[in-house]
């Protein structure tokens, strides 16, 4: 009796760790704004899968509130893991109520509801402090 139960627990643990490993690796994305190139890791969720299916994708992003670059899709993307949370500089998020795809480049410590985390830019996000509205291209990194 003890061995089958232990085997079942070990199997469940292995599944959990493999899922975490896949999520931790994520999807590598190349982001280009003007002549600046950044890399990001996008998380595996429904929102990300919907976005990546459209790559390569160039979006006219608007500088909003001195903290974020934003593009509003005409139609909603799936967002089944939204939450109220803060954000970090470099986060790439989707704000479900206005179909907003957002790069957070400055911090104001606001907590935002209905936020779906999409990914994280590794470095260089500070360039958006000086670009104003700009076309940004998203594609798979090689």
Residue ranges of each PLM-predicted region?
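Bacterial N-terminal signal peptides that target proteins for export
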Residues: 1-8
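Short, compositionally biased
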Residues: 103-119
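N-terminal secretory signal peptides
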Residues: 25-74, 79
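Loop/turn positions that initiate beta-strands
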Residues: 90-91
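Well-ordered alpha/beta subsegment
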Residues: 118-142
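Bacterial N-terminal signal peptides
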Residues: 8-16
